[in-house]
Structure formats: C-alpha cells, structure tokens
From Swiss-Prot:
It catalyses: 7-phospho-2-dehydro-3-deoxy-D-arabino-heptonate = 3-dehydroquinate + phosphate. Zn(2+) binds at residues 183, 246, 263. This is 3-dehydroquinate synthase. It is found in: Cytoplasm. Its cofactor is Co(2+); Zn(2+); NAD(+). The keyword Methyltransferase does not apply. SUPFAM superfamilies: Dehydroquinate synthase-like (SSF56796). It comes from Teredinibacter turnerae (strain ATCC 39867 / T7901). Catalyzes the conversion of 3-deoxy-D-arabino-heptulosonate 7-phosphate (DAHP) to dehydroquinate (DHQ). InterPro entries: Dehydroquinate_synthase, DHQ_synth_AroB, DHQ_synth_fam, DHQS/DOIS_N, DHQS_C. NAD(+) binds at residues 70-75, 104-108, 128-129, 141, 150. Keywords: Amino-acid biosynthesis, Aromatic amino acid biosynthesis, Cobalt, Cytoplasm, Lyase, Metal-binding, NAD, Nucleotide-binding, Zinc.
Length: 361
C-alpha cells in the first residue's frame, strides 16, 4: 500500500492506494467521527461493493446506506435531497460520517451533502472509477450540476481520508477506464514531462489494466494534484491549471446533455482544443501538440468535438465558466509540455477560428 498526504494544515488527510483496501477496517476507523455511518453509493456500484464495505464497517453501531441512480444526469439538487432524506429519517446527528462509495458523481454529491448536513459532518471518499481515483476524490471540490452549467452549485469541503482500492478497477467498463485516463494524461501535459513520456510508453499496459502500471499512474496523478491543491485549496490561482480542457469539456457536456458524453471524454476532446489553440498561438510546438493529441487518441478518447456543436454553442457555455473573471474568458493553455498557464491574454480571433475549423456537421 502507498500512502500520500495532502497537506492543508488542520484539514490535511491521507490518500491510501493499494489492493483490497475495502476490506481493511483500520483505514476507516480512525477517520470516523463516531459509530454512526451512512454509505452513499449508486445502482451500479452497490451490487458489486456495498456488502463488502458494510462487512468492513460491521463494528459500527449504526450503519445505513442510500443508493442513488447512476449517471451525470442525476447529479442534481433533487437527487441530493435523497441523501438528506435518509440522514433525517434515520436520525443521523452531526457526529455521523458519510462515506462516498462510487465515482465522481457519488463523491461530489456525498461531499456536498456532508458540507451541508447540520452545517457540516465528516466524510470519507472511496472512489471506484479511475477518474474519481485520480481526480475528483482528491481536493475537496463538491457539488451538483445546474441545467445551465456543470458544478455551478457546490462547496470546497475536504474529506477525512481517501481510500483508493485499485482492485475495483477490474469491474470498470472500458469506456470509463478511457475516461479516467483523460485526467491521468492531463497531469503529464500540465506538469510532468517524464510522466507524459512514461504514459506514451505504457498506455497499452494501462488499457490492459496491469496492476503495477495502474497503481503507479494513480500515485503520480494524486501526488501532482495534492501538491497543487496544497498551494491553492480554493482555486484562486495555480489550482486552475488542473482544469486543462475542462472549459471546452464542460461546454460539451452542457450542450450534449449530462450523460451523453462522459466527463473524461469531454475533457479529452477539450484538451485537444486547448493544445491546438496553444499551438496556433505559437505557445506550444506543433510536434508537442501532435504528441498530446496522439496520446489522447491512444487512450481511446475522442479528439473532435461532437458533431453538430457550433462555435456559438461553445462560446455561450464557456461564457459562464467558473474561471471567467470580470466578464473575460480565461483558459488553461500550454506554454510547452509540462508548463500550463491560466490566462485571458490570448487572441480571441484565433480561438474563434479554431472552433470554426473543428466544429463540423
């Protein structure tokens, strides 16, 4: 087992990475506020791992669970209320601990419920998708979507621990594996050229779910994210580089309807647009751009926007992105591989031409 630490002073917490961790009570017990626990999961994960986690937590005096519908389209205030309804009906108090057993949607919603219930209770992240293991479970971003924009309602609220059992990836659908690899690739592009080069060599091993390759990719990804979040917990500065491709990607998700493209697919196509814009601006060498696009494609991710999405649709959704400052669009772009910047200082004409060139059908 590997253990990382996200250093946030009093809000610091461990990130455990290894196999069969769901069966280890010692990883959970120190992080429970009391013997009250509510496990939040979804209809896909519950048949696979809920009983296993409940057995691990069988020493708890009060152990309840709630099973949410699966999918980004259910990341809403209405479904969030299901968690609150269960907490209240089962008389959980402010000493309870919520455990998020699932992917990014479950983790984001459980964290937001924990931030809100009785003005804040503890929670633990147990991510079951590659994307949530390397990204959404670490860093304290929680929330739900709004019809006009992704993650528009939420809070920064840190977990007590993140327990990453790599063995659960054995049951992950191939599409979700590729989606998670989008976030893994992102870390190499924005901050770590040796890791990017390692990914170029080891993508076949990752797609084949070789355990050592996956564990290494997860550890490096979490270490990069932990390092960035430790410097900028509330995303007022450098943390925004973790959103490479996300402004374009969130626009795709909002336009298509949540759930049509999974998040990692939208981020993959978004990173291609971000790299191509960086190249057209003269900030990223064309060969480096080609390498990034090739790696994204090798992971089985889309490299083009969805057919029928217009440049105007992109601009309309990007205008409400959370990085917009004083009415100005800011993007995460590349000044070379391994060097991401957050900037609004780019030629908008170049962006508009890129979207015209890439938006087809």
């Amino acid at each position: 087992m590997r253990t990382l630490n996200l250093d946030l002073g009093e809000r610091s917490y461990p990130i455990f990475i290894g196999q069969s961790l769901l069966q280890n009570p010692a990883l959970f017990t120190p992080h429970l506020s009391s013997q009250q626990v509510l496990v939040v999961t979804n209809t896909t994960v519950a048949p696979l791992y809920l009983a296993q986690l409940k057995a691990t937590l069988s020493h708890c005096d009060k152990l309840d669970s709630v099973v949410l519908p699966d999918g980004e389209q259910h990341k809403t205030l209405g479904v969030l209320n299901t968690i609150f309804d269960t907490l209240i009906a089962q008389r959980h108090n402010r000493k309870t601990t919520l455990i998020a057993l699932g992917g990014g949607v479950v983790g984001d919603m459980t964290g937001f419920a924990a931030a809100c219930y009785q003005r804040g209770v503890n929670f633990i992240q147990v991510p079951t998708t590659l994307l949530s293991q390397v990204d959404s479970s670490v860093g304290g971003k929680t929330g739900v979507n709004h019809p006009q924009g992704k993650n528009m309602i939420g809070a920064f609220y840190q977990p007590q621990a993140v327990v990453i059992d790599t063995q659960v990836l054995d049951t992950l659908p191939e599409r979700e594996l590729s989606a998670g690899l989008a976030e893994v690739i992102k870390y190499g592009i924005i901050a770590d050229i040796p890791f990017f080069e390692w990914l170029e060599t080891n993508m076949p091993a990752l797609l084949a779910r070789e355990s050592e390759a996956l564990a290494y990719a997860i550890e490096v990804s979490c270490a990069i994210k932990a390092r960035v979040v430790a410097q900028d917990e509330k995303e007022s500065g450098i943390r925004a580089i973790l959103n490479l491709g996300h402004t374009f990607g969130h626009a795709i998700e909002s336009h298509q309807g949540y759930g049509d493209w999974v998040h990692g697919e939208a981020v993959g196509a978004g990173m291609v647009l971000a790299c191509e814009l960086s190249s057209r601006l003269g900030w990223l060498d064309a060969k480096e751009c080609d390498r990034a696009v090739a790696l994204i494609a090798a992971a089985g991710l889309p490299t083009e926007p969805p057919s029928g999405m217009s440049p105007d649709a992109f601009m309309r959704y990007m205008a409400i992105d959370k990085k917009v400052l004083d009415g100005g669009l800011r993007l995460v772009l590349q000044r070379g591989l391994g060097n991401a910047v957050v900037t609004g200082d780019f030629d908008a004409v170049v962006l508009q031409q890129l979207l015209r060139d890439r938006c087809i059908g």
